[in-house]
């Protein structure tokens, strides 16, 4: 250590400071100042010196065995941060190398004696907008896992493809006249180029698209198997029909009565549609969830969607105008037969098949108007708990089978024809929705379940729970369930209903059969013929697959409900080959879900013309080990894939009951924080916390550089009395907050983007994008580069070779390395990618304090870095003298002997007198020991405000701090 006087200061690495503040520049009041043009923290580590009045100390820093002359200060200030390592040259170079040498190709005939790892992204829809920075989040995570497993000796399957059929391409074709095939291929080319620019280790030899006939041949083949098993059928069902788009929409594609795409009106109307009987697999889909290593939240969403419940079907006789029973009954499904005596009205869905039979003439017009009103809502909107309940009295009554009471029949849209029987018995005392409806329309309320835990004051509050039954007996029917528990009463009601013919026990599901047809062109043709004479449906022969789409130039809706394919007359009109009878091809196409239901299987054997997948290959690669995608697919996509997989399991195509062993949903990357202020009519700012009627003022967006944080709030820098509102939104073109990854790669490099997205926070959590935050990880990569390669020359370029030595590593170096190996490995395995990066940062910080960089330390670290920052790692590996890619090098393993925390108690003297002790690791450096001493409560009072003359350190023995009482005092706090 230098003998000249030092100013006592507790230093934090500037990179660590930037890391801690990475989510917003306003979270800390710390300011790093430097006389240089670049912030002090942006300078190469070796250029950081004690500056006094802007004059740099003349001392030089030793690194390895070499003394390096510092470049001039003028040259230093002219080198921009993004030039401190040559990512512009490195990244394209290694991307070409990987592609030219097919480094990540998985052979068709792999060595099956080795373990396998199949990691898969939910493949993207190739939209015209291309990727935004939210897409690479999941792709980077799967790439890190794939690279780790390759280096651990696994056969890795890591493919990419395109979910390319769908409504957006068809709408674009209608608007522009461009064929959807042309648009799709163009979009795929752009997506592929963007993905390659990010260095993902996909096996591009296995690339596929759902729009390729060689692929959808097998989608059609699966449909035929479903048809043969009676799982594909036609039915008249109420659907979301969009006249403007000319197609049926899923509930998820309808928002506030209009189509999500285009905002076109949507109505409910019955149509004959192809359906898939997913309900036949409801129990298996539910039971097998317990065997899956999925997040409990995803499994619970699937359980709720399937919605298995046990209850009873009960029959209510319809009464005529004189109050007499008719021969017509309304059957309801209820999970609470114990509350039967509390049913004071009934509700039927607007689509109920008996509604036209019992509605009275006086109420008919109101009912018809209400049916039209309800037809403009999706099922999701109709069943939203928070919505205002609406309905119309039908004018008719039904008989409560338990007590003989005549109860009114209402029609309301919160009851769905597709669930249960399309009718409910309403018990307003014990159901929140029924209670809201009853209060609104002055319908009687009868309490029949007592909650013994409630006070008497709560006795007349709605109570949906279980309890003791009361007010539930009658001589007319002989049914008496008073004083029974809810469970006992339910069993007794079911037994009574079955004995008297008033109902039966029933298991019900919320899950509905899958509506499988779309009235559009750009989708897989359904391989079915309809005979002209009888209307009978006939499956086409498997030998005729694929049934390809005909070329069409007009994709506009027909206006009649007929799909666009009906315009291809010569394609539609055909004959049944087996009988010679005239027939027509089915003109509806499959939904976009179809191609994505099974693509994971085709990736195992993508070029096979004879089978969907080779049995041996499927047996080896199944199931997918890790499947990563957005939470928006946690229900339907996964449920549909599981359904098809179970059908394929039943017919012997696949060997596993489930397709995906582990599913992970990544969080959403939100747009950058937007700061909103308000101005009054005079143009003066109005503070957000002092004005209640902000909506009357003009909103303005304030740039981040004009904002500061004050306490828990954000305020105008020029006027801190003006409070602002920070908001974050999902990235969207309409908000103008989409960040293009191409721009980030150009500015900072692909490795920086990869590293930043993994470092933003826990992988499964939502995060806010902050472009300034990427500078921190870029600095880390630059420091890593300089640690191995050295300083740039005066022109900003770097010499060939490295600073690595062949010295034997010290015990401290080995411990630091193996601690890093253990942390990085564990964190990748646990998908805690951000803390794995923190471990590498700690290593680099420690390595800068060493006098040398031994090969036995640096090479393993480069391998650790490679899954995260593969371009830089490949370049460093090459410069370290290795001729081949590191992609298949063995990933380092931590030696437990170096992970033991061996600590010692170190005496600390001040001016030769022992003042206390500190606990340090064996091999602790002088600087680290001094920092610990200065942070110790007992020792701080001797050091605070003092100037250090020198330090005497005997490792493992003693630290003696000699104070200079004549020098200027500087606080340690």
UniProtKB/Swiss-Prot annotation:
Family: Belongs to the class-I aminoacyl-tRNA synthetase family.
Encoding gene, per UniProt annotation: EMB2369
Disruption phenotype: Embryo defective. Developmental arrest of the embryo at the globular stage.
Listed GO MF terms: aminoacyl-tRNA deacylase activity; ATP binding; leucine-tRNA ligase activity
Protein source organism: Arabidopsis thaliana (Mouse-ear cress)
Reaction it catalyzes: tRNA(Leu) + L-leucine + ATP = L-leucyl-tRNA(Leu) + AMP + diphosphate
Gene3D superfamilies: HUPs (3.40.50.620), Isoleucyl-tRNA Synthetase, Domain 1 (1.10.730.10)
Localization, UniProt: Plastid, Chloroplast; Mitochondrion
Residues spanning the signal sequence: none
EC number: 6.1.1.4
Protein name per the record: Leucine--tRNA ligase, chloroplastic/mitochondrial
Gene Ontology process terms (BP): embryo development ending in seed dormancy; leucyl-tRNA aminoacylation
PROSITE patterns xrefs: AA_TRNA_LIGASE_I
Keywords of the record: Aminoacyl-tRNA synthetase, ATP-binding, Chloroplast, Ligase, Mitochondrion, Nucleotide-binding, Plastid, Protein biosynthesis, Transit peptide
Residues annotated to bind ATP: 733
Enzyme class: ligase
Its biological purpose: Catalyzes the specific attachment of an amino acid to its cognate tRNA in a two step reaction: the amino acid (AA) is first activated by ATP to form AA-AMP and then transferred to the acceptor end of the tRNA.
Source taxon at top rank: Eukaryota
Entry keyword annotation includes Transcription: no
Motif residue range(s): 'HIGH' region: 126-135
Motif 'KMSKS' region mapped to chain: 730-734
Transmembrane feature ranges: none
């Amino acid at each position: 250590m230098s003998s000249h006087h030092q100013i006592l200061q507790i230093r934090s690495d500037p990179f660590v400071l930037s890391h801690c503040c990475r989510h917003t520049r306003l979270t800390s009041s710390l300011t790093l100042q430097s006389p240089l043009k670049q912030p002090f923290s942006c300078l190469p580590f070796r250029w950081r010196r004690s500056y006094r009045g802007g004059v740099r100390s003349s001392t030089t820093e030793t690194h390895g065995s070499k003394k390096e002359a510092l470049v001039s200060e003028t040259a230093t200030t002219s080198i921009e941060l993004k030039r401190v390592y040559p990512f512009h040259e490195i990244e394209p170079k290694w991307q070409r190398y990987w592609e030219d040498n097919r480094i990540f190709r998985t052979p068709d005939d792999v060595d099956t004696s080795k373990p396998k790892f199949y990691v898969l992204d939910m493949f993207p829809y190739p939209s015209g907008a291309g990727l935004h920075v939210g897409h690479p989040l999941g792709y980077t995570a799967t790439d890190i896992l794939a690279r780790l497993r390759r280096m651990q000796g696994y056969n890795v399957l890591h493919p990419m493809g395109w979910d390319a059929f769908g409504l957006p391409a068809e709408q674009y074709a209608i608007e522009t006249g461009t064929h959807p095939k042309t648009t799709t291929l163009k979009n795929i080319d752009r997506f592929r180029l963007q993905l390659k620019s990010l260095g993902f280790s996909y096996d591009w030899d296995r690339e596929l698209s759902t729009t390729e006939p060689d692929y959808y041949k097998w989608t059609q083949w699966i449909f035929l198997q479903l048809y043969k098993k009676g799982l594909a059928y036609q039915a008249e069902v109420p659907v979301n029909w969009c006249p403007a788009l000319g197609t049926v929409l899923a509930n998820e594609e309808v928002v506030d009565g209009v189509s999500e795409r285009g905002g076109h009106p949507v109505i409910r109307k019955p149509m004959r549609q192809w359906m898939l009987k997913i309900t036949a697999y409801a129990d298996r889909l539910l039971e097998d969830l317990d065997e899956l290593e999925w997040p409990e939240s995803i499994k619970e969403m699937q359980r709720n969607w399937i919605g298995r419940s046990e209850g009873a079907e009960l029959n209510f006789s319809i009464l005529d105008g004189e109050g007499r029973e008719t021969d017509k009954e309304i059957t309801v499904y209820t999970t609470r037969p114990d509350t039967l005596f509390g049913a004071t009205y009934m509700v039927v869905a607007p689509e109920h098949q008996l509604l036209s039979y019992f509605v009275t003439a006086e109420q008919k017009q109101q009912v018809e108007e209400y049916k039209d009103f309800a037809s403009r809502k999706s099922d999701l909107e109709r069943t939203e708990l928070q919505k205002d309940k609406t309905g119309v009295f039908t004018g008719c009554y039904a008989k409560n089978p338990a007590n003989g009471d005549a109860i009114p029949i209402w029609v309301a849209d919160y009851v769905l024809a597709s669930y249960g029987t399309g009718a409910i018995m309403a018990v307003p005392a014990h159901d929140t929705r029924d209670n809201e409806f009853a209060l609104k329309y002055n319908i009687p309320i009868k309490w029949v379940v007592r909650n013994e835990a409630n006070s008497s004051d709560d006795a007349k509050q709605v109570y949906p729970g279980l309890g003791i039954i009361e007010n539930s007996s009658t001589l007319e029917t002989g049914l008496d369930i008073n004083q029974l528990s809810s469970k006992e009463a339910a069993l007794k009601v079911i037994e009574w209903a079955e004995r008297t013919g008033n109902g039966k026990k029933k298991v019900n599901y919320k899950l509905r059969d899958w509506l499988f047809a779309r009235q559009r062109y750009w989708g897989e043709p359904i391989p079915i013929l309809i005979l002209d004479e009888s209307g009978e449906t006939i499956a086409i022969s498997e030998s005729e697959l694929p049934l390809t789409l005909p070329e069409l130039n007009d994709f506009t809706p027909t206006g009649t409900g007929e799909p666009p394919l009906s315009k291809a007359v010569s394609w539609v009109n055909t004959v049944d080959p087996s009988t010679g009878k005239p027939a027509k091809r089915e003109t509806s196409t499959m939904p976009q879900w179809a191609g994505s239901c099974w693509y994971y299987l085709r990736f195992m054997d993508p070029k096979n013309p004879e089978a969907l997948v080779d049995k041996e290959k499927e047996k080896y690669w199944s199931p997918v080990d890790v499947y990563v995608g957005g939470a928006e697919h946690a229900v339907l996509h996964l449920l549909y894939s599981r359904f098809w997989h179970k059908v394929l399991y039943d017919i012997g195509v696949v060997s596993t009951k489930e397709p995906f062993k582990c599913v992970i949903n990544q969080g959403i990357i939100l747009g950058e924080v937007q700061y909103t202020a308000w101005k009054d009519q005079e143009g003066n700012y109005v503070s957000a916390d002092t004005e209640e009627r902000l909506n009357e003022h003009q909103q303005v967006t304030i740039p981040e550089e004009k904002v500061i944080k004050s306490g828990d709030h954000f305020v105008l820098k020029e006027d801190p009395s003006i409070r602002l509102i920070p908001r974050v939104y999902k990235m969207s073109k309409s908000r103008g907050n989409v960040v293009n990854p191409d721009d980030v790669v150009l500015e900072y490099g692909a490795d920086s983007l990869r590293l930043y997205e993994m470092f933003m926070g826990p992988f499964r959590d939502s995060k806010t994008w902050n472009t300034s935050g990427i500078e921190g990880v870029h600095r880390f990569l630059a420091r890593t580069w300089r640690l191995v390669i050295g300083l740039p020359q005066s022109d900003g370029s770097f010499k060939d070779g490295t600073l690595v030595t062949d010295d034997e590593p010290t015990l401290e170096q080995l411990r630091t390395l193996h601690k890093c190996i253990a942390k990085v490995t564990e964190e990748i395995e646990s998908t805690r990618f951000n803390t794995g990066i923190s471990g590498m940062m700690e290593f680099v910080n420690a390595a800068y304090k060493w006098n040398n960089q031994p090969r036995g330390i640096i090479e393993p670290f480069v391998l650790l870095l490679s899954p995260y920052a593969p371009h830089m790692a490949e370049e460093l590996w090459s410069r370290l003298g290795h001729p081949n890619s590191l992609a298949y090098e063995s990933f380092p393993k931590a030696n437990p002997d170096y992970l033991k925390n061996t600590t010692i108690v170190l005496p600390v003297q001040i001016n030769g007198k022992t003042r206390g002790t500190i606990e340090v690791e064996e091999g602790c450096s002088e600087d680290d020991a001094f920092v610990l001493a200065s942070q110790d409560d007992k020792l701080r009072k001797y050091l605070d405000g003092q100037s250090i003359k020198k330090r005497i350190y005997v490792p493992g023995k003693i630290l003696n701090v000699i104070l200079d009482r004549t020098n200027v005092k500087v606080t340690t706090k």
